[in-house]
């Protein structure tokens, strides 16, 4: 009898450890995918600044044409889309399973900073998905021929960003992205075990600067384009 109880306990403990390892591996993957997407955003924001060049869009349209015709870039687009979708799926899976694993009647008067940040990530992530649909309708789906629009993306950007409500929507989008990146930057280091009391504050400050620079780059294009005469 004692042996059976011991065996049952061992199996439960082993199963719990496997589930814990499985959950941790997902968190690590979410962190790595988030880091990859953050690097892409820096590239995307830098490329968008070309819209502000005083050349009638020649350089920016040449860049867009290269991005749309190069097979290596096309393959990268698939990888990027896959990384984005996987990042979303795993984040939602972790949020749901963590909530389900919480005992009924569980109550914690003072929520930790990590818990609040994680909850913020989920909600800002959902808002980002909604905003990206707007962005895809304005640009990416036009490139794919799924919706009508100007294939001269320099002119398309000017036409869209000079509409007040669209410009405001994009600026709000960048604010949401800022909050998501601001927490996500530090969360990557925490998940990978690289965050500690000695470097934690510096990591958070760098994350704020990184998120601010990227979002300001995006916002600058929208604001200046909005103020320009088409």
Q: What do the PLM-derived regions correspond to, one by one?
A:
Residues 2-230:
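Membrane-embedded alpha-helical bundles that constitute the cytochrome b-like, heme-associated redox core
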């Amino acid at each position: 009898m004692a042996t059976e109880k011991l065996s049952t306990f061992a199996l439960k403990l082993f199963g719990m450890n496997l589930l814990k390892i499985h959950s941790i591996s997902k968190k690590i993957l979410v962190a790595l995918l988030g880091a990859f997407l953050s690097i892409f955003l820096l590239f995307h924001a830098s490329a968008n600044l070309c819209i502000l060049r005083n050349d009638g869009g020649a350089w920016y349209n040449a860049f867009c044409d290269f991005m749309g015709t190069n097979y290596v870039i096309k393959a990268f687009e698939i990888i990027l889309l896959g990384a984005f979708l996987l990042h979303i799926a795993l984040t939602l899976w972790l949020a749901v399973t963590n909530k389900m694993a919480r005992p009924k009647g569980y109550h914690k008067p003072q929520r930790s900073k990590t818990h609040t940040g994680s909850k913020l990530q989920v909600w800002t992530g959902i808002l980002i998905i909604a905003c990206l649909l707007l962005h895809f309708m304005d640009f990416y789906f036009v490139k794919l021929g799924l919706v009508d629009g100007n294939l001269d993306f320099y002119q398309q950007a000017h036409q869209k960003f000079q509409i007040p409500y669209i410009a405001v929507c994009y600026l709000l989008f960048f604010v949401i992205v800022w909050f998501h990146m601001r927490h996500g930057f530090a969360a990557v280091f925490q998940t990978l075990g690289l965050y500690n009391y000695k470097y934690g504050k510096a990591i958070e400050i760098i994350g704020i600067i990184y998120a601010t620079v990227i979002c300001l780059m995006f916002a600058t294009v929208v604001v200046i384009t909005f103020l320009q005469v088409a």
